[in-house]
């Protein structure tokens, strides 16, 4: 297992509060997004070797820094070691909610295995267009897998539960990166979510495209969705009954 980087960050308010969210990126990924924001970590394996006990130490140190939640990204390639680390950390006093920052693409059996160790998921819902998923992420089965995984999360967590201060106690947040020029993918992703989100999990629409991967293969240089287009997509989400963060 390799730890790519870790830090305190401002995420969605319900997982950051006033103290921030602890974010840990593990190295490796089961997708190959050409535009990945952490391309060196996810695709090239950059990072520092770590044992489960060392990852447990890191989780406890983030708790000591006062974060409200801890989000672990790229869990699936190191699933066994992550489970061991979480078990050690819980035995040593880790009390914070743990979130799996999840790309949505893992096989269902692996998702089932990991669910009991996390209080929630922050799940990407990247593609409704399977061909686009294949071209940009080498993930042609993405829409079907994402829908299957969302069903598993919905069954396991049920509707989101929040503390009195508005912080997420258990449940799921969804994210969708709006890819430049691929507006139809976003529109269809919203329609697909509307059909397969029985618990009404809220969605963050992400308008800032900042590729750091194989720039020859991505859709565009760094780009922010025009305000008018973003309003159209937000209006479609509202029309479909999707709650936006």
Q: Where do the protein language model's features map onto the residues?
A:
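Conserved non-cysteine loop/helix-boundary elements of the Radical SAM core domain that shape
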Residues: 41-54, 74-81, 132-156, 182-185, ...
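Auxiliary Fe-S-binding modules of radical SAM enzymes
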Residues: 158-245
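Alpha-helix-loop-beta-strand connector modules within alpha/beta enzyme cores
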Residues: 85-95, 148-153, 230-233
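Short amphipathic alpha-helices and their capping/turn segments at secondary-structure boundaries
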Residues: 106-117, 190-200
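Non-cysteine beta-strand/loop elements that form the S-adenosyl-L-methionine
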Residues: 115-130, 202-209
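Conserved Radical SAM active-site core
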Residues: 2-116
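Hydrophobic faces of well-ordered beta-strands that scaffold small-molecule active sites
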Residues: 22, 70, 98-100, 121-123, ...
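Active-site beta-loop-alpha junctions enriched in small/polar residues
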Residues: 75-77, 103-105, 126, 177-179, ...
